[in-house]
Curated annotation (Swiss-Prot):
Biological pathway: Cofactor biosynthesis; thiamine diphosphate biosynthesis
Domain of life: Bacteria
Name recorded for this polypeptide: Thiazole synthase 1
Reactions the enzyme catalyzes: [ThiS sulfur-carrier protein]-C-terminal-Gly-aminoethanethioate + 2-iminoacetate + 1-deoxy-D-xylulose 5-phosphate = [ThiS sulfur-carrier protein]-C-terminal Gly-Gly + 2-[(2R,5Z)-2-carboxy-4-methylthiazol-5(2H)-ylidene]ethyl phosphate + 2 H2O + H(+)
Catalytic-site annotation from UniProt: K97 (schiff-base intermediate with dxp)
Main location: cytoplasm
Cell membrane as UniProt keyword: no
Binding partners and assembly: Homotetramer. Forms heterodimers with either ThiH or ThiS.
Signal peptide: none
Molecular function per GO: thiazole synthase activity
Gene source species: Syntrophotalea carbinolica (strain DSM 2380 / NBRC 103641 / GraBd1) (Pelobacter carbinolicus)
Length: 258
């Protein structure tokens, strides 16, 4: 399968994985391995600096995975920028998944504060991957600001509803000059396959892997879904049409056409 390129860096996997909600760090590590992912997101607020032996980061091989700190929990641009700076000061690479979600109930991203934070972080040398509503206009503004990707949601975080914003994501993909990563709401392998068939460059999944009784098994299923969707997109899906069209000719065998 062709490689994903973000900010000049190449990845063989197009599946990004989040680290929240897993019942244990060992289950998370097994899921990461089964997913084949090379980009792993982690909330800085979940890192236990005082107990490194029990810390989440102790279970993530930094030589194998790109650790992508996220600004989960930030309610405005100032908080998001502060979290990104803390991650870099803690030794993380200057890559950040930008999340600004002032509403704790639906966790929908704030477009104004996200753009404001992105502009600041790009100027400070961060590789910014912003989580956004499926808003084509905002996506263009973020690309113009210098973000490395745009990450439109398929559905609200953790809902497992799939690609409910399909029409808007299709516009974003059509207009994008950076990779498009569909993030949030993807609850089944068929959902990620759908996103990849549309032409998305990658997907990010967390809840669907973390809450299943078999995280590693589900991670493998998502890996296969991403690969199938990407291969179908590259091969070229047939156009949909209203009328039926037989795959074999119906004439000249049972009867002669006049």
């Amino acid at each position: 399968m062709d490689e994903l390129v973000i900010a000049g860096r190449s990845f063989s996997s197009r599946l990004m994985v989040g680290t929240g909600k897993f019942a244990s760090n060992s289950l998370m590590a097994d899921a990461l391995a089964a997913s084949g992912s090379q980009i792993v997101t982690v909330a800085l607020r979940r890192v236990d600096i005082d107990r490194p032996e029990d810390d989440l980061l102790a279970h993530i091989d930094r030589d194998k995975y790109l650790l992508l700190p996220n600004t989960s929990g930030a309610r405005d641009a100032d908080e998001a920028v502060r979290l990104a700076r803390l991650a870099r000061a803690a030794g993380c690479e200057p890559w950040v998944k930008l999340e600004v979600t002032p509403d704790p109930y639906y966790l929908l991203p704030d477009p104004i504060e996200t753009l404001k934070a992105a502009e600041i972080l790009v100027k400070e040398g961060f590789v910014v991957l912003p989580y956004i509503n499926a808003d084509p206009v905002l996506a263009k503004h973020l690309q113009e600001a210098g973000t490395a990707t745009v990450m439109p949601l398929g559905a609200p975080i953790g809902t497992n509803k799939g690609v409910r914003t399909r029409d808007n994501i299709a516009i974003i993909i059509e207009q994008a000059i950076v990779p498009v990563v569909v993030d949030a709401g993807l609850g089944a392998p068929s959902h990620v396959a759908e996103a990849m068939e549309m032409g998305a460059d990658a997907v990010l999944v967390n809840t669907a892997l973390a809450v299943t009784p078999d995280p590693a098994g589900m991670a493998n299923a998502f890996r296969l879904g991403v690969e199938a969707g990407r291969r179908a997109f590259l091969a070229g899906l047939p156009a949909q049409q209203q009328k039926a069209e037989a795959s074999s000719p119906l004439t000249g065998f049972l009867r002669d056409e006049q």
